[in-house]
Amino acid sequence: MSAEQQAVVSAEQQAVVSAEQPAVVSADQPAVTWTVVVPVKVTSQAKTRLAGDLSPTQRVELVRAMVVDTVAAARATPTVDRVVVVTDDPDVVADLSADEPAGTDAERRADPSAENRASTSAQHPCLRAHLDVVPEPSPAAGLNAAIRAGVASARSGGGLAAVSVAVLLGDLPALRPGDLGAALEAASAHHRAVVTDADGSGTTLLTARSGVELYPAFGPGSAAEHAARGHVVLDVADVPAVSGLRQDVDLARDLAAVAALGPGPRTTEVLDRWARLGEGSSAA
């Protein structure tokens, strides 16, 4: 466990494993909608384990593409109302802003015309959910601090009781709205839930229903740590092994797995261009 995890675990662990609520939510609860928090570190510092396969420029390009595709999938998921991206990277902010249609979010929502709805849906199918970008508290503070800042922003209006939150990592380029929607539906049956990555040791999705605190413990072995903190592990019946939600990218072999699943358009464009130019051949 990292020093950051140790700094918060004792008080949080006691709260999580207490009998404050049953582990399973009553079946007669209304349908759940979610705010998704996506933490994104400065891209020049990301994916260092790919350094032996990709140049620094390629790593930055890949990370930016994966974030765009991951966020687009989240915003296209019907049960997601809002996506909060936590980042200090201006290029990521610019990438996410580039796909926004004309007019403010409020203006688009206020226009009831079928023409406006059809145009927005056809040209910007990822824009069902509202997008907010909030600054990272401090790059030195780490991933879990960024997540806590995003969750605080997500719940700033109505507080803990008002918003169900899901933390989604930004390196899931093969994610589809159906993948995330199915996982969130399964997660809605539990006060806290977790989806593990393809090898079962890491975490790609961490959820907490409204009224429930979320205690992120991302880092090596995070899946086991999150389970110990009271998050129900969603198995392959809920999230299949071949789901894009499980396939994050840390190593070159992960890019091959992503290519087999079919990445989103931005990541596809990057990988296809590298293939044409003969770049990153050991990773693609």
UniProtKB/Swiss-Prot annotation:
Enzyme Commission number(s): 2.7.7.105
Swiss-Prot/TrEMBL keywords: GTP-binding, Nucleotide-binding, Nucleotidyltransferase, Transferase
EC supergroup of this enzyme: transferase
GO molecular function: GTP binding; phospholactate guanylyltransferase activity
Binding site for phosphoenolpyruvate: 203, 219, 222
GO biological process, one term: F420-0 metabolic process
Keyword Ribosomal protein: no
Biased segments, Basic and acidic residues type: 105-114
Pathway assigned to this chain's UniProt record: Cofactor biosynthesis; coenzyme F420 biosynthesis
SUPFAM superfamilies found in the cross-reference section: Nucleotide-diphospho-sugar transferases (SSF53448)
Assigned protein family: Belongs to the CofC family.
Functional note: Guanylyltransferase that catalyzes the activation of phosphoenolpyruvate (PEP) as enolpyruvoyl-2-diphospho-5'-guanosine, via the condensation of PEP with GTP. It is involved in the biosynthesis of coenzyme F420, a hydride carrier cofactor.
Full protein name: Phosphoenolpyruvate guanylyltransferase
Organism lineage: Bacteria, Bacillati, Actinomycetota, Actinomycetes, Micrococcales
